[in-house]
Amino acid sequence: MLRQITDDVRIAMEKDPAARNFIEVLLLYPGVHALISYRMAHGLWNMEFNFLARALSQFSRWITGIEIHPAAKIGNRFFIDHGMGVVIGETSEVGDNVFIYHGVTLGGLATKKAKRHPTIADNVVIGAGAQVLGPIHVGRNTKIGSGSVVLQDVPEYSTVIGVPGRVVYSGISADMEDSDGLESFPDPVARAIECMLDRLPQMEKEIRMLKETLKQNGIDQKEAVVIDQETMKGNQS
């Protein structure tokens, strides 16, 4: 447990450029405090001291604003940045080297006593306010955008955004492989605009050719528009 706590502090120093030294992170980072409490509560839970485990978890929630159920399974080098509002449910499973921001929920959709929370594989980044719900699996090296609501399995090396969450990129990217945060997210709006700009020269060429064809056939452009509108109305009726 001590080694895990040490790793949790060190990963916070690696991930957060504002972290200055080991002591500062250990004493002043609520995400680290919540993890230390969780590690202790999880040990108590495994020894079947369930009430004490829940009591420690509840105390940590009051102090840090972060709720982690003591039965959840969390791997090594886990970092919660800022932390406030994070909720990790009872049957959640989190791999190694996972990085989440404030307001993230790993929640359940069912009320039955079974696996009802998500499984997060290694090297996943989850943006602020994202909701990952249900007994789904999020593959390794995936990045989930801020405010997304993820309800289905996500393949590894994916980028997920939106409500409901959708995969906008899937595959290995050198930028994403080397990135620890969200800065390497592909921008779907920018991509759509790029596609439109790529198509624009071809469309202009086709319009010029169409105008030339109309001119050669002695058809006025305005008349052609009127004819086309009448044709469309006839098809609709």
Placement of each model-derived feature along the sequence:
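Terminal amphipathic alpha-helical/low-complexity segments used for targeting or macromolecular assembly
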Residues: 1-61, 175-237
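A structural signal for small-residue-enriched, beta-sheet-centric alpha/beta enzyme cores
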Residues: 166-178
